[in-house]
Design a protein with these regions (language model features):
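Pre-Walker A adenine-sensing motif
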Residues: 1-9
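Glycine-rich phosphate-binding P-loop
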Residues: 9-34
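Conserved nucleotide-sensing/catalytic segment adjacent to the nucleotide-binding pocket
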Residues: 35-93
């Protein structure tokens, strides 16, 4: 088992790790994703475990379901069961977010995961994270967008 400095939320059983130094916006973005339907897996410290060829995220038992919200303190939220991680999002300042990201991966416990960089305080950060997680869970994060459109849409163009 590996414990990392990251928050983690899950949507439909698919988890995303939100990484960044203290104050980078991990809990802030996680809270906005929870407001949009995600569930908290872990806040600030995430345990990773390898199961077959899957990486599973969970919360240390002492903080399960607890989220530290700046200005409010610790708040209890609904906690997700351990969830399979499909994506890592590094939280960075706006100038460090590439307009067109190159494919990038990072390994945890010998399992490679796709990585993206996002500005967590951008108004659209939560929807970008949600869309990226959907694409990563389907194995299509770095495919060109037109490859993901239904054929009927491509024919109409």
């Amino acid at each position: 088992m590996l414990t990392i400095h990251a928050s983690c939320v899950a949507i439909g059983g698919h988890a995303v790790l939100l990484r960044g130094p203290s104050g980078a916006g991990k809990s802030d973005l996680a809270l906005r994703l929870i407001d949009a339907g995600a569930m908290l897996v872990a806040d600030d410290r995430t345990q990773l475990q390898r199961q077959d060829n899957r990486l599973i995220a969970s919360s240390p038992g002492t903080i399960r379901g607890l989220m530290e919200i700046r200005g409010l303190g610790p708040v209890r939220v609904a906690a997700a069961e351990p969830s399979r991680v499909h994506l890592v999002i590094d939280l960075v300042p706006p100038a460090m977010v590439p307009r067109l990201p190159e494919p990038r991966h990072e390994s945890f416990l010998d399992i490679a995961l796709p990585c993206l960089s996002l500005d967590p305080f951008e108004v659209s950060a939560a929807i970008k994270a949600k869309l990226a997680l959907e694409r990563a869970a389907a194995g299509r994060l770095f495919e060109p967008a037109e490859a993901q459109l239904p054929r009927r849409v491509l024919r109409a163009s």
